[in-house]
């Protein structure tokens, strides 16, 4: 018989996934978590109000800064995990990003078991709250979410990491430390500059014959002009970053919102509707 797969060393493989959490002020929460496959240590975690790449980064970036860079990260095909941003971040740090085959959850048993533990030992103690509950307690949504993350971190560090795991016979923290002692070195931590570079949002554009680049309906003038050259746009930095040194000047900004931002609804016209005659005597209202 073949036993279940397990990474031989710490930071050989991280497994990531998202879990639906409690309602905070009538808003749904999601837990992003990353588990070291060898030790079962929770290397990164964060509750957020959306299941997107922004909240994914909030869990992954501190994990890399504190626990080091893994050789591989194994995730499913959720929208946040297949985003090009995650692929770019992993490539910048030399991490192999692996997605499970659709409908085949093999290799995800450890993170799923951890989520069962979260439900049975942590979430059972957390009560859903409404907006009225937060108002009565004098807390806003941000403060309530921070408190949820604080409580979860305390549970992970004082309970989960120190309890003996039934499969390994060691606590996750003990197995993590023992693994590095056996390897004879500590985790390789990325520099702050490398992390910042890896987690930039990036878009590529080609310079037009008029020496401009366009991004989200905004036009930027390139100086010096390089028609046909490829430029990469990165955020949070507010500059265009080409493969060669130059600057880009914003010359036309008809749009002030990102494409994912919700557009305001149009107010109804207060003027009364008037009938408009069409052919064959029909009347429509506008």
What are these regions (language model features)?
Residues 121-220:
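Active-site-proximal acidic segments at structured loop/helix or strand boundaries
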Residues 48-52, 260:
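A short acidic/small-residue loop/turn micro-motif
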Residues 208, 212-215, 219-286:
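Protein C-terminal end segments and domain termini
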Residues 40-45, 98-100:
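Short small-residue beta-strand/loop micro-motif enriched in glycine and branched aliphatics
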Residues 73-93, 97-123, 129-137, 146-148:
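RNase H-like two-metal-ion nuclease catalytic core shared by retroviral integrases
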Residues 1-35, 41, 53-62, 66-71, ...:
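Mobile-element integrase/transposase regions
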Residues 61-78, 243-244, 274-282:
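Short, solvent-exposed cationic patches
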Residues 17, 40, 60, 73-76, ...:
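Mobile genetic element proteins and their domesticated derivatives, centered on retroelements
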């Amino acid at each position: 018989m073949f036993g279940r797969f397990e990474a031989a060393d710490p930071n050989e493989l991280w497994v990531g996934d998202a879990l639906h959490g409690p309602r905070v002020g009538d808003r749904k929460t999601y837990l992003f978590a990353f588990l070291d496959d060898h030790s079962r240590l929770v290397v990164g975690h964060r509750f957020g109000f959306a299941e997107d790449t922004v909240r994914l980064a909030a869990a992954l970036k501190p994990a890399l800064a504190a626990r080091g860079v893994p050789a591989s990260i194994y995730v499913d095909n959720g929208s946040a995990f297949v985003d090009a941003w995650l692929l770019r971040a992993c490539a910048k740090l030399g991490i192999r990003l692996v997605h499970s085959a659709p409908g085949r959850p093999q290799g995800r048993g450890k993170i799923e078991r951890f989520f069962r533990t979260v439900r049975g030992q942590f979430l059972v103690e957390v009560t859903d709250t409404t907006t009225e509950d937060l108002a009565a307690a004098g807390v806003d949504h941000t403060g309530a979410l921070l408190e949820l993350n604080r409580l979860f971190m305390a549970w992970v560090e004082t309970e989960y990491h120190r309890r003996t795991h039934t499969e390994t016979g060691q606590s996750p923290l003990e197995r993590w430390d023992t693994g590095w002692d056996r390897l004879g070195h500590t985790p390789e931590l990325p520099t702050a500059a490398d992390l910042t570079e890896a987690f930039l949002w990036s878009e590529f554009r080609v310079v037009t014959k008029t020496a401009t680049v366009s991004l989200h309906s905004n036009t930027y003038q390139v100086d010096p002009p390089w028609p046909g050259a490829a430029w990469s746009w990165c955020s949070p930095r507010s500059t265009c970053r080409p493969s060669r040194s130059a600057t880009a000047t914003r010359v036309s900004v008809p749009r002030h919102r990102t494409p994912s931002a919700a557009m305001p609804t149009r107010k109804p016209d207060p003027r009364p509707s008037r009938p408009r005659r069409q052919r064959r005597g029909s009347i429509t209202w506008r």
